[in-house]
């Protein structure tokens, strides 16, 4: 595969970075909190896997992440805004519809997009997010304090320590991430989730203690399928082979 080129476009005042590789039916990939398009999708082999399956593979850096604009006002990370960034990318590329797959926070953004603009989403794949789309507001706000701490050694909360270490590993802007976690903790109600009318696959690792049950969420979304990713936690589910195989099957079978 040739070198992957990062491209950019403006969504209002925010410059968003993305990659656009291959030909075929388009799929847009939306990464999780404190990650980026490379860490979530390129390095674990998703871009290669999808291209080999004949898919045009598009992945963006969410606002505040990767090579996209860093923002420090929590209000600018509302999930409605982040979901609309995906719609803006579709507009920029001249795509009326695409399959959309998100992981963790990216799955939340994908669900919000599917509800607000279902006509733009051919199918939605939610990885690393189950019933916590409904039952809570995403990752706990204590993670913001962990990101703002002087060093990882100052963080005692296990989940906060994990995300602080991950943010350092991905060389992220920790203050932008702290603003993101404070501003993007919106949920959908059961009645709002029931309005989603696109084919949906919900995949969660059996050792994931962050996402919540995929089956509980699937029961609320008409026609949704749930998938267990065996033996994987929140971080290790992303590149799992069984997850990839299930996604490829789902893409082949969806209308």
Residue spans of the language-model regions?
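Conserved alpha/beta-hydrolase "nucleophile elbow" surrounding the catalytic nucleophile
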Residues: 98, 102-107
């Amino acid at each position: 595969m040739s070198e992957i080129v990062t491209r950019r476009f403006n969504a209002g005042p925010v410059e968003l970075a993305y990659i656009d590789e291959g030909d075929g039916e388009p799929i847009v990939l939306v990464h999780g909190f404190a990650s980026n398009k490379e860490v979530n999708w390129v390095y674990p082999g998703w871009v290669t896997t999808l291209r080999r399956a004949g898919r045009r593979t598009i992945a963006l850096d969410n606002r505040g992440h990767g090579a996209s604009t860093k923002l420090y006002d929590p209000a600018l990370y509302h999930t409605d805004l982040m979901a609309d960034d995906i719609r803006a990318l579709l507009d920029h590329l001249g795509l009326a519809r695409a399959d959309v797959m998100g992981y963790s926070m990216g799955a939340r953004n994908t669900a919000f997009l599917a509800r607000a603009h279902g006509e733009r989403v051919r199918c939605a794949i939610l990885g690393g997010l189950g019933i916590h789309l409904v039952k809570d507001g995403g990752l706990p706000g204590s993670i913001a304090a962990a990101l703002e701490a002087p060093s990882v050694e100052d963080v005692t909360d296990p989940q906060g320590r994990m995300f602080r270490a991950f943010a350092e590993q991905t060389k992220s802007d920790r203050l932008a991430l702290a603003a993101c976690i404070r501003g993007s903790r919106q949920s959908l109600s059961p009645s709002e989730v029931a309005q989603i009318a696109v084919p949906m696959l919900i995949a969660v690792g059996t050792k994931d203690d962050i996402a919540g049950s995929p089956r509980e969420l699937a029961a609320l979304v008409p026609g949704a399928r749930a998938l267990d990713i065996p033996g994987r936690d929140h971080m290790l589910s992303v590149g799992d082979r069984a997850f990839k195989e299930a996604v490829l099957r789902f893409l082949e079978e969806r209308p």
